Amino acid sequence: MYQKLQAPTLSSKEAAIQLLSRRDHGQYELYQKLALKGYEEADIEAAINFCLDHNYLDDLRYAKSQVRQHVYKGHGERRIRQELKQKRVAESIIDMAMAEEPQDWFELARMAAEKKFKGIKAKDQKEYAKQVRFLQYRGYSFDQISYALSFEDED
């Protein structure tokens, strides 16, 4: 039922470079992936240090990439911050990434609401609560949600 981990065929540095060639990873994420492949902790640390020294691994670049990706998906600032914290990106790096990728969160919330609800204003309290929950899940603040839901159906 359970398979025993086989000894990896690539060195930890080669495996790290191979993973980073596909897409950017955070330091912790790369550590986890290498550990799952069965590499020793010392080898993983050496591979991560090698990647950091050669600028193959950069948490700021990774965080900025994640911010762009989440904004494209219609996620708000709170959700993006939470996702990056789960991937153990430092708070200072998250702040820098958010500052370097400026967004109008109010307009993004409005666009997300418009896309989901087709510009239709809630008819009753239950429907309004559903719209608020959707935008909260997406990571928008209450001010942003109020702004987004204040627009009337313009048809």
UniProtKB/Swiss-Prot annotation:
The keyword Cytoplasm applies. Keywords: Cytoplasm. It holds the Pfam family RecX_HTH3. Its main location: cytoplasm. One of its GO terms (cellular component) is cytoplasm. PANTHER family: REGULATORY PROTEIN RECX FAMILY PROTEIN. Modulates RecA activity. This is Regulatory protein RecX. It comes from Vibrio campbellii (strain ATCC BAA-1116). The lineage of its organism: Bacteria, Pseudomonadati, Pseudomonadota, Gammaproteobacteria, Vibrionales. The gene is recX.
